């Protein structure tokens, strides 16, 4: 199939933004987006095929699908030089592909008069690639979010991993697994920001189970994600300021307040022997984005539920036909390496 994604109304016009001002008076301010009358709708070409299979009187079901989409004329706001009087300009700047697989499996291992046990499993994986940007217009990278670490679009030939959702930031220098130090303090990479990870997971999935025994029901639902990265500025500030429990490891009970860090002195090429104040070392070590980027993999217990359906004979002399009582909990536990 082929579809066109158009802009929202008035996005190509040089209109004013109306807001509520001081004292209830309305104010009108100029739009900070430079109007582009030549912009075209995005073009999306998609392919998908799959199958739905049932076996053993539908006690085993498999639903699988493969898809691929190609998006051209991507509409992205491009940051302008402030001297232009505008912040951004919407432009058609590239091509991006997505392809992946989605799988659902349903199984009923046990089914008797009084007991039934069912399992359901789902899995999905998507591979994204930024094929091209507007290199002919001097646009080889686009920063979508920039505060500390940066969420950027880059192709593979611009020191990027070539996929949507990539994180870039500053990082400490390691050589042969050894932290590089100068004057006893960690050395931070100078120059272009390095690749930290991608916010999108490698794959996601879920597992659910249901038990039914006579009038009782019990169900559990798990969700899981493998891969992906998450950036936490809270972690950086908490470690630098000593407000996180992990920062206790840096404190000296004797009050000496000095540390000889494990690493290589860049000036001598030998093991570091320079002692520096702990406070200075901690602030230098945690003043980079790499240290606050974590693997976003997780396993979640999304829901537990237990229920009981009252026997119909108990309702015989009432206007009620069915009554069920349930207790459930949602988002009960999460297992992950991301710090709280």
Model regions and ranges:
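Extracellular/periplasmic, surface-exposed regions of secreted and cell-surface proteins
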Residues: 1-154, 288-340
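Short glycine/proline-rich turn/loop motifs
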Residues: 29-30, 186-190, 281-290
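A short local loop/turn or secondary-structure capping micro-motif enriched for an aromatic residue
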Residues: 71-72, 189-190, 227-229
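Conserved small-residue
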Residues: 91, 108-199, 239, 250-251, ...
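Conserved SET/PR-domain catalytic core that frames the SAM/AdoMet-binding pocket
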Residues: 120, 191, 201-214, 302-307
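Generic beta-strand hydrophobic packing signal
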Residues: 170, 207, 216, 304, ...
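Glycine-rich, aromatic-lined ligand/substrate-binding cores of catalytic
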Residues: 198-233
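Extracytoplasmic gating/loop element in the C-terminal half of outer-membrane beta-barrel translocons
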Residues: 227-324
